[in-house]
A protein has these predicted regions:
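Multi-pass alpha-helical transporter architecture, strongest
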Residues: 1-3, 197-231
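Juxtamembrane intracellular "pre-TM" segments in multi-pass secondary transporters
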Residues: 5-42, 228-231
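Short amphipathic helix-loop junctions that connect adjacent transmembrane helices
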Residues: 57-74
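Helix-to-loop junctions at the C-terminal end of transmembrane segments
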Residues: 87-101, 185
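Structural signature of the two symmetry-related core transmembrane helices
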Residues: 103-118
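Helix-loop junctions at membrane interfaces in 12-TM secondary transporters
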Residues: 120-132
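Intracellular juxtamembrane helix-capping segments at the cytosolic ends
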Residues: 141-155
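A membrane-interface helix-boundary motif in multi-pass transporters
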Residues: 183-203
Length: 231
């Protein structure tokens, strides 16, 4: 309470930080052809995070509109999914060490796709509970696997740039995913089942995009560029 702040206020610091972040992201974006595997990963991350954003922001809406969940049901679902997400992140951490980054991410994307299928065909609350817990299992692990590979593909001294572009892609996905869901329900007259089915396309496309990614090649490219920039 008695500590005095001696720093001089800088009103433009926030705007300068945003501008600097955007410039860094643009610089990294222009250099993507030199890092093809990072480009693949960023595209994949954008796609699957579009789907994840839909699940995070609109799962309660789907549960109420399609499955007839009450507010109490939704609160319980969120609570249990958080527990499942913690267990999934812990378990997939070990799986990632054994399978490698790419395979671990591929497994989580398949789980996400399975969740969409179960949610789409759910006719009872039990089926939807299964879908919700599948989402929990995949949620933390898919995000951690992607971020781990960003660190592998980033040259020494440029980690902030690469993570900046990765975070920008995730920010865009948080807008595009829910917006696409909303547009589909609007066009189809509140057909939430069709909207959740369409959300599965994000995960399916992410799997297709991920297939040609080569972690070893991307890591070697990062080391090569680090050595070149240090010379």
């Amino acid at each position: 309470l008695w500590l005095k702040e001696r720093a001089t206020p800088c009103p433009d610091a926030k705007h300068a930080g945003i501008a600097e972040s955007l410039r860094g992201a643009w610089t990294t974006l222009k250099s993507l052809p030199q890092f093809p595997d990072f480009g693949i990963l960023t595209t994949c991350g954008f796609l699957y995070q579009c789907g994840v954003a839909v699940v995070i922001t609109l799962s309660a809406v789907y549960a109420a509109a399609v499955m007839g969940f009450t507010t109490e049901d939704t609160i319980l679902m969120v609570f249990l999914v958080n527990i499942t997400a913690a267990a999934g992140a812990f378990g997939f951490g070990y799986a990632q060490d054994r399978l490698g980054h790419k395979r671990a991410l591929m497994v989580t994307l398949v789980v996400w796709l399975a969740m969409i299928v179960v949610a789409y065909f759910s006719e009872t609350r039990t089926h939807f509970w299964i879908a919700a817990n599948l989402a929990g299992l995949a949620m933390g692990s898919s995000q951690s696997a992607g971020r781990a590979m960003v660190g592998v593909f980033a040259p020494e001294g440029r980690q902030a740039e690469f993570y900046g572009l990765w975070n920008l892609a995730l920010w865009l996905s948080a807008v595009v995913g829910p917006l696409s869901y909303g547009m589909i329900t609007w066009v189809t007259g509140n057909d939430h089942r069709l909207a959740i089915c369409a959300t599965g396309l994000f995960f399916l496309l992410a799997i297709v995009v991920l297939v040609p990614l080569n972690v070893e090649r991307g890591a070697a490219r990062a080391k090569e560029m680090s050595a070149r920039e240090a010379a």
